[in-house]
């Protein structure tokens, strides 16, 4: 964590996200924060700005609440689809907590799906997925496989509220545990299970336990490979979104420490919902709230002197629809100047 020295003049970090737009090597951008701080609005706005400077942008929501559809006023689902009014900005909504059963069920119907034929007897399913988080890890791996094959130049993740945000970093370990357990079972009971399953027609797709292990191994490799990219500051960065209140500041600090411990780059904080009452305003509530916000904003700027801290105003209307998002997104690159 940076020291809390006072920073002067030219040393101040630019209060915009321009550095992210200028960094052409970036492939993965995560936007995260506490619930209700304007995470989705920020990720949509950042994606809009990226679409101006990059060939192709994919915006993915991994938040089960799925607010992308609401933000753009357009229905998104598991498949990437173009956002209305853009030729190089697509969006999709996935649920990484979704059960692996959906993927398993697609086994027989989709011959070339990487997960095809993963179906197995209930006993094997229970054994394979008894390790906490393995279904989530495999769902996430499946999403990453799909995303990699789509070859977008940059991918923006609108993540679930903090707590779930960084779970994906533990997935390679989780899958390694599942693989170790399955390998052990396979060596002990493989021949017997294969003969039992063989007697009743085998696994869907005519596979055996070894092929199941190979599939899980390929998913683990996908996650491991992408995680290596996540830890490369040239390819990945994390944008923290917060509001100027104690709990949100505390959550942001916790998240930044966790990101640092995982070796993930973060150098930008967006502070949303700031009030700027006019000079001599008679609104007591506005002035009291501004005073409180000012205190926390000063703390943020002291704590994160080497971060780009972007100050965004509280608006009178909800930011929904293409036009309002575009207007909001401009403030990520051109600092908001409150009216005098």
Curated annotation (Swiss-Prot):
Residues the entry annotates as binding Zn(2+): 283, 286
Residues forming the catalytic site: 63
Record-linked Gene3D superfamilies: P-loop containing nucleotide triphosphate hydrolases (3.40.50.300)
Keywords for the protein's UniProt record, in alphabetical order: ATP-binding, Cytoplasm, Endoplasmic reticulum, Hydrolase, Metal-binding, Nucleotide-binding, Transport, Zinc
Gene Ontology cellular-component annotations: GET complex
Enzyme Commission designation: 3.6.-.-
Transmembrane segment boundaries: none
One example of a Gene Ontology biological process annotation: retrograde vesicle-mediated transport, Golgi to endoplasmic reticulum
Domain of life, source organism: Eukaryota
Compartmental location: Cytoplasm; Endoplasmic reticulum
Amino-acid positions noted as binding ATP in the UniProt annotation, renumbered to this chain: 34-41, 245, 272
Molecular function via GO: ATP binding; ATP hydrolysis activity; guanyl-nucleotide exchange factor activity; identical protein binding; metal ion binding; protein folding chaperone; unfolded protein binding
Pfam families in alphabetical order: ArsA_ATPase
Coiled-coil regions listed: none
Biological role stated in the UniProt entry: ATPase required for the post-translational delivery of tail-anchored (TA) proteins to the endoplasmic reticulum. Recognizes and selectively binds the transmembrane domain of TA proteins in the cytosol. This complex then targets to the endoplasmic reticulum by membrane-bound receptors, where the tail-anchored protein is released for insertion. This process is regulated by ATP binding and hydrolysis. ATP binding drives the homodimer towards the closed dimer state, facilitating recognition of newly synthesized TA membrane proteins. ATP hydrolysis is required for insertion.
Assembly with partners or alone: Homodimer.
PANTHER family: ARSENICAL PUMP-DRIVING ATPASE ARSENITE-TRANSLOCATING ATPASE, ATPASE GET3
Family affiliation: Belongs to the arsA ATPase family.
Name of the molecule in the record: ATPase get3
């Amino acid at each position: 964590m940076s020291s809390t020295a006072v920073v002067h003049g030219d040393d101040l970090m630019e209060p915009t996200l321009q550095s992210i737009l200028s960094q052409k090597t970036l492939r993965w951008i995560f936007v995260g924060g506490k619930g209700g701080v304007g995470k989705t609005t920020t990720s949509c706005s950042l994606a809009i700005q990226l679409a101006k400077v990059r060939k192709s942008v994919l915006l993915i929501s991994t938040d089960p609440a799925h607010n992308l559809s609401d933000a753009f006023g357009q229905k998104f689902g598991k498949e990437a689809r173009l956002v209305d009014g853009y030729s190089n900005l697509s969006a999709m909504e996935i649920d990484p907590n979704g059960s692996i059963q959906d993927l398993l069920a697609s086994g027989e119907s989709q011959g070339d799906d990487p997960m095809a034929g993963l179906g197995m007897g209930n006993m094997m399913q229970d054994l394979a997925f008894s390790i906490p988080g393995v279904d989530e890890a495999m769902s996430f791996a499946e999403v990453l496989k799909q995303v990699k094959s789509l070859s977008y130049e940059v991918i923006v993740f609108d993540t679930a509220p903090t707590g779930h945000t960084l779970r994906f970093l533990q997935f390679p370990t989780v899958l390694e545990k599942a693989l170790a357990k399955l390998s052990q079972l396979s060596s002990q009971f493989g021949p017997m299970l294969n003969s039992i399953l063989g007697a009743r027609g085998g696994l869907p797709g005519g596979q055996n336990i070894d092929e199941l292990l190979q599939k899980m191994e390929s998913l683990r490799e996908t996650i491991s490979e992408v995680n290596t990219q996540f830890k490369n500051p040239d390819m990945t960065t994390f944008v923290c979104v917060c509001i100027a209140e104690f709990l949100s500041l505390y959550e942001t600090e916790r998240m930044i420490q966790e990101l640092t411990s995982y070796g993930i780059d973060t150098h930008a904080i967006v502070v949303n919902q700031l009030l700027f009452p006019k000079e001599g305003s008679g609104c007591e509530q506005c002035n009291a709230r501004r005073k409180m916000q000012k205190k926390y904003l000063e703390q943020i700027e002291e704590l994160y002197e080497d971060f780009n801290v972007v100050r965004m105003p509280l608006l009178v209307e909800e930011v929904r629809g293409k036009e309002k998002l575009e207007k909001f997104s401009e403030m990520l690159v051109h600092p908001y100047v409150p009216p005098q």
